[in-house]
Design a protein with these regions (language model features):
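Intrinsically disordered, low-complexity regulatory segments enriched in Ser/Thr/Pro
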Residues: 43-85
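Short, flexible helical or helix-coil boundary motifs
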Residues: 13, 17, 56, 87-90
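Negatively charged, low-complexity tracts enriched in Asp/Glu with abundant Ser/Thr
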Residues: 1-40, 74, 80
């Protein structure tokens, strides 16, 4: 699973994301957090997605989705199928 897979899954479901922040640890690891919106006109976030990955190949090493409504963790995703299931449940 890569960052491209994440963006593609979100777009297919019809949500919009904006990159909130990105931290590069300098050793090849990066942590990104995305704010998930229902549409481009929406200002209220549905969820926050944290993805940890290596810059080479952007292979995901950790992925979690936190619901904005109550800040509970939706799922720690190990596969793109887990991630898509979580997004559809929002």
């Amino acid at each position: 699973m890569t960052t491209t897979d994440i963006r593609k899954a979100i777009e297919e479901i019809g949500y919009t994301i904006t990159s909130s922040w990105r931290k590069d640890y300098g050793d090849g690891r990066v942590l990104s957090e995305y704010k998930l919106l229902k549409s481009e006109k929406s200002r209220k976030p549905l969820a926050f997605i944290q993805a940890g990955y290596y810059t080479a190949g952007k292979k995901i090493i950790g992925l979690s989705v936190t619901l904005a409504s109550n800040m509970s963790n939706c799922i720690d995703c190990n596969t793109i199928q887990d991630f898509e299931t979580c997004l559809k449940a929002i």
